[in-house]
Amino acid sequence: MAKAERSKYFNFYILNIKLRKRTNQKNLAPEDYVRVMRKVHREKIHEESSPNKHCIFRFMFEEKAKNEVEYLSGTFAQFTFIQNERWFNLKSLDMDEEFKVPEGLFPDAKITDYVFIPKAHRFCYRTSADFNISPYAIRKFLEKALDKACRPDEFVQVDVESSKESIEAILSAREIKKLMIDINYSNVDIGSDLKKFVEEDIKASNTSRFQVVATQKPDVSIDVEQSTILSGALQSAISDGEAEAVIIDENNRTKRIKTSQFPRKESIYGVKSRFNQLVFEKIMRIFRNNGN
């Protein structure tokens, strides 16, 4: 008799993928995201995720509803990328001119599950003791691989979702000495009016990235809430960029807070075979009102 699956918690990171047109401000459709993702998988495109490490999609399956792709899912791998160069032999203590790694074989592979939701343009991957790779490494892979699969008039921007606690830590500081924000704009995401104001302004100006640096007056904290631009940009940094602040904490110590130190990690509870569906449902609840 087959052993029943046990329900447990599964954790995952979230990356925000935005496919853009170079020549206009049009938001590309979910099917465009599917097209680009499929091409990366079909052509076995592998790209660097960190020094000497590459990633590649192993499998990619579709889940459809009403003739639309709800999500893509499968597994991807990170491996050590070795190029045949000069090898040193520890036995002979000399260069081995004959040795070559068999073509197409790479060591130290780690494999995990992923889910990509085109309507929310979010890429999620399961993290575990066996696959605890930084989402910033996965972002590097996705940006390079997806860029290769784009049409000539398209480009890709990828951001790691940060936790709201990172912004709250900045805003609750006793004193904000300096604030640096680097953002782009979202693709039909839900958000506050301030966030929408800043992002629509960036979009209207044909700007791909927007950077702002705010420095305090002597001995006076930056008041973020009194600035429409700073408030909106800081909220945008959660999903569409990064922020960094130099603050004075309650113990009068100078600290540096970066949103990149607080990647958003979500979890679902259920059996492993339902991981993809549960992630899809949660992402749609978070980033799309009523799944629209």
Model-derived features with residue positions:
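Terminal interaction module
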Residues: 1-93, 101, 109, 130-292
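Short, compositionally biased low-complexity segments enriched in polar/charged residues
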Residues: 95-117
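Glycine-rich, often proline-containing surface loops adjacent to acidic residues and nearby aromatics
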Residues: 114-126
